[in-house]
Amino acid sequence: MLFTIASAIFFLSLNDGHAQAQTDESRRFEVGGQFSVLNASNGRASVTRVLPCLVPPCPTATSTSEGHETEPGFGARIGYNLTKDFTLEAEGNFFPREREFGGGRKSQALFGVKAGKRFEQAGVFAKARPGFVRFSEGDLSRPRPGIACIAVFPPPAACFEATPKTHFAFDLGGVFEYYPSRRTLIRFDAGDTIIRFGEHRVPIVIDPGSGSGVRQVVVGTAPSETTHNFQGSIGIGVRF
């Protein structure tokens, strides 16, 4: 997809000198694609267990789910310029890496505004775009069929089936654009993707502490919380 857009930009740049009659204000639509990175987690949970001992009270140990990880991805964007400096836009991204403890693959959709100042060869903007982020394996609340699990705490992750979970997101940040020609642009984004997590259950890796080195994967409840996650992208686009 990005190769196709890049090819279109190249040919449009070659022919741009023959289309000077069309003003920038008449180029209302923008389409493009981007590579993006999102530094996020699937919520944070912890479990506390009692370690075996001969004489009570026995000591306890707390294990916590994994923190933030940087996820590479790609996506597409479309915009409509209400004025030269104010744009309505929609963007979708897909992060294909499937990590067992990171909520699986992630997809993102954002819809909002971009406002700032566009100059002859560059533009600087702020953006505000609400939307959502979907984790393909974001919740471990559904019991796995056909598996009889003993009622122990913390419950083993093998007793549950991973299901998708969608959370509200809000993208706040800045945009810098460079215009190789009147029709084409190169875009750089940086911002804070705010994710509002609802309560859900996530896997936690624990060491039983027996000295055997055998790790166990259990399930813990991640409470409702709001997290701040850096997201950056670089992309290309065409105006028409």
Where in the sequence are the language-model features?
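Cleavable N-terminal export/targeting peptides
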Residues: M1-S26
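Intrinsic low-complexity/disordered segments
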Residues: N15-A19, V31, H228
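Short N-terminal segments immediately surrounding and downstream of signal-peptide cleavage
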Residues: A21-V37
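C-terminal beta-signal and adjacent terminal beta-strands/loops
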Residues: R183-A190, I194-D207
